[in-house]
Amino acid sequence: MAEKYCRVTQMLGKQSISFANPVYIQGSASIVGKKEGEGPLGHHFDVVEEDDKFGQKTWEEAENVMQQKSAGMAVEKANLQMKDIRMIFAGDLLAQSTASSFGIGALGCPVYGLFGACSTMGESLALAAMAVAAGYGENVMAVTSSHFATAEKEFRFPLGYGNQRPLSASWTVTGSGACVVSAKVSRVKITGVTTGKIIDDGLKDSQNMGACMAPAACSTIVQNLKDFGRNPDDYDKIITGDLGYVGQQILLDLLEKEGYAAAKVHQDCGILIYDRETQDTHSGGSGCGCSAVVLASYIIPKIACGDWKRVLFVPTGALMSKVSFYEGNSVPGIAQAVVLENAEN
């Protein structure tokens, strides 16, 4: 009789995974543009480039270079070489993910291309953690990027048009962040993930993405708390990706209706990265690079030094395309959650 196959399940609740053995962030790095360097977190980033074209001829080529550089720095900080990376999970905002194709493609590593809009860093980090936890790779990378000029060209208006932006609009971050996830013990570990659902409340205003994404953020956060049997105060911080000032208040109101008070522990990468009073960024920052660079150069170091013991990282995405928008469709949202902890916790 064939021996019955047995496995230890790591599934938890309805949408979560609790890793039987934690995986670790071995190295992380970020590269940003001039505007991001002038913001409150400017001194945290690894590289601040004064030239938003990064020495290239086009904005798109600049974004390619950002991904290459952030990936290279993350590998170097992990004391590895690119040949040690088993696979890369990469994504961006451009059509057919060309920044990842041309940027990461030049590194010669196996790649999975992803699209989760501005939630892509959460998606890529969750998948990298699952791959390492399952034994599919010892060192796996998660990397994403965005660029203000490429996003404006792709989704909004030509830069020379000079359109008036509403106060609910966000500012796409020029930046790329990368993390090397490994089985080797380091100071920051990933202990679980919660996979988000697509939530569509029928909102159609692409200039108010925070409102479009807030219900998805609420859905994922609530499910994480239920699956892990936790309350918001069990996290030092619950940090969303790019809800901005508008989306943050909506999220907190929605969580209150679900019975969770999270105002004391909630932060948002889109709020942290810019000073809206002096930088004219309205609701805050957005883009795949927003949560990625804040994670790589601010959140992870805060956990590594012990300032924070446990953080719920929840990047958020507005799942629209220029075609769906022009056809009058709504803007669905999604949020992916990753539980980050100090290794001694």
Regions found by a protein language model. Give the residues of each.
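Active-site pocket-lining segment
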Residues: 241-282
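Short, well-ordered amphipathic alpha-helical segments that serve as non-catalytic structural scaffolds
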Residues: 63-79, 125-127, 212-227, 294-299
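Short glycine/threonine-rich loop-to-helix capping motif typified by GTGT followed
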Residues: 101-104, 243-258, 323-331
